[in-house]
Curated annotation (Swiss-Prot):
GO terms for cellular component: cytoplasm. SUPFAM superfamilies: GroEL apical domain-like, GroEL equatorial domain-like, GroEL-intermediate domain like. ATP binds at residues 30-33, 51, 87-91, 415, 478-480, 494. CDD domains: GroEL (cd03344). Belongs to the chaperonin (HSP60) family. This is Chaperonin GroEL. Its EC number is 5.6.1.7. Together with its co-chaperonin GroES, plays an essential role in assisting protein folding. The GroEL-GroES system forms a nano-cage that allows encapsulation of the non-native substrate proteins and provides a physical environment optimized to promote and accelerate protein folding.
């Protein structure tokens, strides 16, 4: 078993700082509209070209185990900021490096790291309050497009498509990003509720050319169990035939005699009917059937609630103005559910989203919520090559997350200016002198994103910072044009949530690193030289006799 190597105090923190610097230097080049690309080698296929901070951070593994620990801790900042706010990974990395670097100088000079940590925490708290006070809600589609454009590295097409998608499906709607088959980036919007189950038999098709089923003003029978016995279905089929309206049957499965009878009646023209399997599995299937029932004003036929198939009437069926079914999907548009019932169901799903700890469950609950309140928009990302496609798709996903964050908590002047505007509030904090050092660390660090944006644009960062400090409000440096002015008016805005999480996560990890006193890593095992092959192979000479086999 390999032994352990241990480093203490200054040596440990210096090794960590070397790792932090290596990672932060690679990530920081991507910051701002004039940020540069990073090319990442892949073990197969073409290299990845990216301007996304978290993608760069995830690729970095350092050979020195102590330096690597520092790099991994800052990588965690980037990942966490990306997961919670959807963007701001590069800002978070730049801040974490600056806070740790400044703090490490003070600790190396003999100051108390715990007091510095308390100062950093206090400064972070005050800065977050200041950011909340500066924040303005997104007023219109134009501002949403501006946030998307900035997060997609100044690509206006992406910003406009995201804003259009949000307008069409609402703030709660699901927006997914797919790879397009062409070079154009387009938006498809599905109104109503769509689930991934197609017709059970092609004989249900009403449009043979498009191979789709279209039902207008239709009843919907929602059944939890399998249907195989026709006898159970007959009463309700007779009632719908008398009413002269189409019928959609949703059930766990429909097979045997039941499916055959439905197909025969459809072909004869006795009954305009279609059947699909219920979406989802297990408990999620039950919940989705309840969602469909709420949306269409029907009842789920289930023994659990004492409703059986033979006893139901037309009043128990759901109803929708239009239903479209193809071989893969069913879309229900304009269900007849009561508004109050739908709102109650939405409230219930929102509460479940708040309570769940599983990312997978949260994603599925959000999909259900979107299907009830808005619809689904699909952004199809097009590009000339696969390399460009991957890079563009990552930018669209970033921009989408940032836009959602902006709608949630509002926006701030971008370009690192919002953080610089916190300096005034930080300078007024009254705490013990040693803790005050921690506040000064944060005050120096929050200038760093603006300095880096300016440096990446080929301008001296310190000059830009002084000019911005001498003004107030949303006055700042627009790196895209090289001009100074009102950044909010120029459309250079950042989501409040993104800036807040970047600062909080950076302060958190930098504090942990500053208060580190020992680091433990495995000693690299010495490679044993390979043994020479034994001399017993000489006996193979006897194989010469094999010649007689020829």
């Amino acid at each position: 078993m390999a032994g352990k190597e241990i480093k203490y105090s200054t040596k440990a923190r210096e090794a960590m700082l070397a790792g932090v610097r290596t990672l932060a230097d690679a990530v920081a080049v991507t910051l701002g509209p004039r940020g540069r690309n990073v090319v990442i080698e892949k073990s197969w296929g073409s290299p990845t070209v990216t301007k996304d901070g978290v993608t760069v951070a995830k690729e970095i593994e350092l050979e020195d185990k102590f330096e690597n620990m520092g790099a991994q801790m800052v990588k965690e900042v980037a990942s966490k900021t990306s997961d919670t706010a959807g963007d701001g990974t590069t800002t978070a990395t730049v801040l974490a490096r600056a806070i740790y670097e400044e703090g490490q100088k003070l600790v190396a000079a003999g100051n108390n790291p715990m007091a510095i940590k308390r100062g950093i925490d206090k400064a972070c708290e005050v800065a977050v309050k200041e950011l909340a006070g500066m924040s303005k809600p997104t007023k219109n589609q134009r501002e949403i497009a501006q946030v998307g454009t900035i997060s997609a590295n100044s690509d206006e097409t992406i910003g406009n498509i995201i804003a259009e998608a949000m307008e069409k499906v609402g703030k709660e709607g699901v927006i997914t990003v797919e790879e397009a088959k062409s070079m154009d980036t387009t938006l498809d919007v599905v109104e109503g509720m769509q689930f991934d189950r197609g017709y059970l038999s092609p004989y249900f098709v009403t449009d043979a050319e498009k191979m789709v089923v279209s039902l207008e003003n239709a009843y919907i029978l929602i059944n939890e169990k399998k249907l195989s016995n026709m006898k159970e279905l007959l009463p309700i089929l007779e009632q719908t035939a008398k009413a002269g309206r189409p019928l959609l049957i949703i059930a766990e499965d429909i097979e045997g005699e039941a499916l055959a009878t439905l197909v025969v009646n459809k072909l004869r023209g006795t009954l305009n009917v279609a059947a699909v399997k219920a979406p989802g599995f297990g408990d999620r299937r039950k919940a989705m059937l309840e969602d469909i029932a709420t949306l269409t004003g029907g009842q789920v036929v289930s023994e659990d609630v004492g409703i059986n198939l033979e006893g139901i009437t037309l009043g128990d069926l759901g109803h929708a103005k239009r239903i479209t079914i193809d071989k893969d999907n069913t879309t229900i548009v304009d269900g007849a559910g009561k508004k109050a019932d739908i709102e109650g169901r939405v409230k219930q799903i929102r509460a479940q989203i708040e309570d769940t700890t599983s990312d997978y469950d949260r994603e599925k609950l959000q999909e259900r919520l979107a299907k009830l309140v808005g619809g689904v928009a699909v952004i199809n990302v097009g590009a000339a090559t696969e390399t460009e496609m991957k890079e563009k798709k990552a930018r669209v996903e970033d921009a989408l997350n940032a836009t959602r964050a902006a709608v949630e908590e509002g926006v701030l002047p971008g370009g690192g200016v919002a953080l610089v505007r916190c300096l005034d509030a930080l300078s007024k904090i009254k705490i013990k002198s040693e803790e005050k050092l921690g506040v000064k660390v944060v005050m120096r660090a929050i200038e760093e994103p603006l300095r880096r944006i300016a440096n990446n644009a080929g301008v001296e960062g310190s000059v830009v910072i002084e000019k911005v400090k001498n003004e107030t409000g949303s006055f700042g440096y627009n790196a895209a044009t090289g001009d100074y002015g009102d950044l909010i008016a120029a459309g250079v805005i950042d989501p409040t949530k993104v800036v807040r999480f970047a600062l909080q996560n950076a302060c958190s990890v930098a504090s942990v690193m500053l208060t580190t006193e020992a680091m433990i890593a495995e000693k690299p095992s010495k490679e044993e030289p390979a043994a020479m092959p034994g001399g017993g192979m000489g006996g193979m000479g006897g194989m010469g006799g094999m010649g007689g086999m020829m």
